[in-house]
């Protein structure tokens, strides 16, 4: 689909659809493929969602969000619009919309993420600041998650050259409180980005979305001090899935804060000790990132030439088989379909209805688990 500016009504429909409680990125694009527009998807949503407690926000509620955003100077960018970042369109599934507050031109520069431990050592924070400053001087925008430690050091050091803070909550929600001054400074001189609406306070389930945006906005991810079980390594995994460069600074084997970095290097991540190491890794990175199609062809079950009752009966049987194959451990969609034996087109229709009715939980990267 060609990029274009959405009308006020179209933007309202996109926001209503994506703000529906059980509509994540996978379901959003499934509905767009099936019905062709957010307006048509909203018209048919009640037939797909059998739970009476799940309904789209009203037009009035979304218009209030749009008015509040405009009043604050926040823009809501939908994935088809020209100012939506190209690198984020190469993520699968594409985040349907993002809220941005600040200097959006920073997304048009080449971006690199610098992430790491909240409880970082003094030397780790010094290294993050040094790398961020030198990469900023080389023309890169620095992306991070506005957390304590490595994130804060990277943001502060690149404030004059360009930095983007990605949040799990709304762009107006300051978290952690220790970073209040940094957050306020970034509104004026940097850029804040989130998939969440204004005023929203993040929960644990929102941070994977934030992490996926951090890697999605960036050509590569630099990891400085990360424990073996940390959100930082989740971001590194997303970067690999998005075909982005993963780089890590080595550390002492006696420091638990660097065990995750050392493991990444052992698994094939690039070892970096200087900003030049990062520049060398990113030299050809842009050519490796290909945009994703916004609208893949609909499955046969999205436009099936059968009676509605027959199609629904087949979908219901497929749902039972897919649910039996699912577990509480997130599983890749292709593996779930293969184990269930359900044909791919029928499985796509069934999984869409299952997500909309909260029978399954679909991670931001598309992996599926029982709710």
Explain the meaning of each model-derived region:
Residues 1-10, 78-371:
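Glycine-biased, small-residue-rich flexible motifs in mid-sequence functional cores and linkers
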Residues 1-83, 357-359, 364-371:
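Short, small/acidic-rich helices and loops at N termini and domain boundaries
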